[in-house]
């Protein structure tokens, strides 16, 4: 009989960035989809937030999740496109000490096999202290594709 392997449980924060979602004009489907894709035996979701595309608020939340909540991983969804309001990558880099470019590159490469629009993503991955922050696209389907490549 195969023995069961014990894996560490990673503390995760999920942040959805959407002006319309924050204002109650659109239901957040991406944040809950991320949670569904994380096996409960390996990931403990300690926080799920829906915020507007406001850089200062995003930075504050990323700092809170990394420093106060001691998350191992923070997954953001949304705010990575070309709109002037899309500031998730800038907020992520502003609070991080090091970048982890291979992760965002892998997500983009995997997504490019499905849609060429993936090249329009400005998503980044970076590290704040001991917390890995990964920007994912804003739609539930794109979240699934991105999660499959990480």
Task: Name the predicted role of every residue range.
Residues 1-149:
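Non-catalytic beta/alpha edge segments that cap or flank active sites
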